[in-house]
Amino acid sequence: MDQIIVRGNGPLKGEIPITGAKNACLALMPATLLTDQPLTLTNAPRLSDIRTMTALLQSLGAEVASLQDGQVLALSSHDLTSHRADYDIVRKMRASILVLGPMLARDGHAVVSLPGGCAIGARPVDLHLRALEAMGADLDLREGYVHAKAPSGGLRGAVIDFPLVSVGATENALMAATLARGTTVINNAAREPEIVDLAECLRRMGAQIEGEGTSTITVEGVQALGGATHPVVTDRIELGTYMLAPAICGGEVECLGGRIDLVAAFCEKLDEAGIEVVETGRGLKVSRKNGRVRAVDVVTEPFPGFPTDLQAQMMALLCTAEGTSVLEEKIFENRFMHAPELARMGARIEVHGGHATVHGVEKLRGAPVMATDLRASVSLILAGLAAEGETIVSRVYHLDRGYEKVVRKLRGVGADIERIKEVADG
């Protein structure tokens, strides 16, 4: 298993290119199942989750070609050979459930494995299923699979009232609604930029959609969708992560392709902490000149609030802030697993349920730490950039799911970082 070694060595300076959003791309790829015409995605990220979605689509008979070193994906679902998404692939990635709505809408039937780790009665996937049932789908859950059939004549437009905001369920309902008969209204829809990006792509394919980016989306179903070429939106989580690198270490870094509207709530917190963010026309320039950052309080919320996927990285910054910060996690449970690892580096953090209190210290010290998930892994790397001495991060395979060339990008702005093969004991 690989490890990443980070040595704190002062301010960073330079440029970091930001790639297309993984979470957007994972929703855009299944949109190929809505049409028999080619769909081309540009600015695609090169990540393990993208390869998993590629394998899933190919198992259904879709063609997926990776061009220009993986930055362009050419997809075609002209002749599907299967409508069954097997557990062996679906268990690797929850986004696999996004093939359900498109297959059901276009061909009237689908069999999709439930994602791994779903506890009965509290499954996030229930919101996806409720939306499709509202559109007339007949769903039968047996042996770990959803067996779905559309009514004769296809899915029907419906009013869908989500009791909770769900990005994935909004995406599934949105794609299914494009080919449903009549009008579909999605209430309490997710407002994330990835939803807006999906709607823009579907509109390029011929869909009639209004209201994306608000909590109510209206879709007028059409008979068929065509092909399109669509650029994947910038990854706002990767953007925020790399913006934190100079915030933690000092220096000045320009994140190419960055946009304020994607990270507005995050930028407000950086401003409170004393970090300067400037739009340049090519991206966002982030700088921290002198002294410690100020403590700030953070509450994670659905977009346009502070994103839960930047909470761990923000905690790394606040570990050395002047004063005490409180982070409240309102999206996911058990999202503070990085806190004990940061404590190994000298951070003073108290966790009580969904709250973490961070008492800023002057300096972190390098230590061996273990990544527990994708965002935790990068938060430990960021902390290591500003720590005294050497930090060794184990279990970094999580990184490959969400960050492309993280070592190369950080090294390009002056970080002392390398990835090595872990040496086994004995």
Swiss-Prot record:
**Residue positions binding UDP-N-acetyl-alpha-D-glucosamine:** R94, R123, P124, V125, D126, L127, D309, I331
Q: Could you tell me which pathway this protein works in?
A: Cell wall biogenesis; peptidoglycan biosynthesis
Places the protein is found: Cytoplasm
Provide the GO biological process annotations.
Answer: cell division; cell wall organization; peptidoglycan biosynthetic process; regulation of cell shape; UDP-N-acetylgalactosamine biosynthetic process
SUPFAM superfamilies found in the cross-reference section: EPT/RTPC-like (SSF55205)
Q: Which Gene3D superfamilies match?
A: Enolpyruvate transferase domain
Q: What class of enzyme is it?
A: transferase
* Catalytic site positions: C118 (proton donor)
Any Pfam family the entry gives: EPSP_synthase
The principal location of this protein is cytoplasm
One of the entry's Gene Ontology molecular-function terms is: UDP-N-acetylglucosamine 1-carboxyvinyltransferase activity
Which residues are listed for phosphoenolpyruvate binding in this entry?
Answer: K22, N23
UniProt keywords (A-Z) are: Cell cycle, Cell division, Cell shape, Cell wall biogenesis/degradation, Cytoplasm, Peptidoglycan synthesis, Pyruvate, Transferase
**What reaction(s) does this enzyme catalyze?**
phosphoenolpyruvate + UDP-N-acetyl-alpha-D-glucosamine = UDP-N-acetyl-3-O-(1-carboxyvinyl)-alpha-D-glucosamine + phosphate
Q: Which residues carry this modification: 2-(S-cysteinyl)pyruvic acid O-phosphothioketal?
A: C118
Q: So what EC number does this one have? A: 2.5.1.7
An annotated GO cellular component: cytoplasm
Task: Give the protein family.
Answer: Belongs to the EPSP synthase family. MurA subfamily.
Family annotation (HAMAP family): MurA (MF_00111)
Its function, per the record, reads:
Cell wall formation. Adds enolpyruvyl to UDP-N-acetylglucosamine.
Q: Which NCBIfam families match?
A: murA (TIGR01072), PRK09369.1 (NF006873)
What is the protein's name according to its record?
Answer: UDP-N-acetylglucosamine 1-carboxyvinyltransferase
Q: From which source organism is this entry?
A: Paracoccus denitrificans (strain Pd 1222)
